[in-house]
Swiss-Prot record:
Its cofactor is [4Fe-4S] cluster. This is 4-hydroxy-3-methylbut-2-enyl diphosphate reductase. (2E)-4-hydroxy-3-methylbut-2-enyl diphosphate binds at residues 48, 84, 134, 175, 233-235, 278. It comes from Chelativorans sp. (strain BNC1). Pfam families: LYTB. The gene is ispH. Its EC number is 1.17.7.4.
Amino acid sequence: MSADKQKLTIRLCGPRGFCAGVDRAIQIVVLALKKYGPPVYVRHEIVHNRYVVEGLQQRGAIFIEDLDEIPEEHRERPVVFSAHGVPKSVPADAQARNLFYLDATCPLVSKVHKQAMRHQRLGRHVLLIGHAGHPEVIGTMGQLPHGAVTLIETVEDALHFPPPAGVELGYVSQTTLSLEDTAEIISALERRFDNIHAPAAESICYATTNRQNAVKAAAPGSDLFLVVGAPNSSNSRRLVEVAERAGARRALLVQRASEIPWEEIADLSVLGLSAGASAPEIIVDEIIAAFADSYDVSVELAITAEEPENFPVMRALRDVELTKADMAFVNGVG
């Protein structure tokens, strides 16, 4: 302990960082590279995290946004669909091109797809609570015919969208939303439509719920709350909002320790720290080390749940063995 350093308590949230769906998606790309060799194409960022994407690029993954970007001479190479899910048109397009694809869609996102399709199969118009333009929303809307889904982003949308005549309604939601915001939208829908149908199971995933609850526990009284995550990560941005609502004096989203605005955050006593579901633990460690350079740091754990969940990869990749270094990367610690 150093006498000339100000004391800083870091409230470290648990759970934080990689969830089972993210872990599985990264593992699929690493396993595909091991089994088939580079390059392996990945449609969209496998998860929304620059560190992960750059690490996979170094191993031989090539990230694309459209199947047209795969050159003719590489049409026999594997292509992986991201954890966020894709519209039905994407695998159909891949099949039409005779591409070999591996679908890394999170099983909990696939569950929402099935819930939406069930609503539609039962003759209901589907309301999707989510954010326009997010890949998961694009993928879920793309499971159903054009016009079969209405996107609801706000309570205002819930109160004023024109419902189709003579059709029952059913709703699902994006898996990474704020629990409170989604509850308000659902409440508005249920007040407006007495017979609206809920999904058979909760759409917001366990990892989103757990990370938000941990932030709620750690944020009150924090001088600053940092969330490790990318600007395009929906669940990470929601954690910043949750921290602010729960009582943090200020909350920021950072991708690396280099983004910490040191000149703006002098004289901290309590720092809250969490990481979005696509952010690796190695960056959390990096941030703690950066604060330890300037402060006498003590770490206080704010653990609100355990996460034993594990999603297996597809059968085609189960015969591949990963090295310790591979597993460290997959688990976000290397």
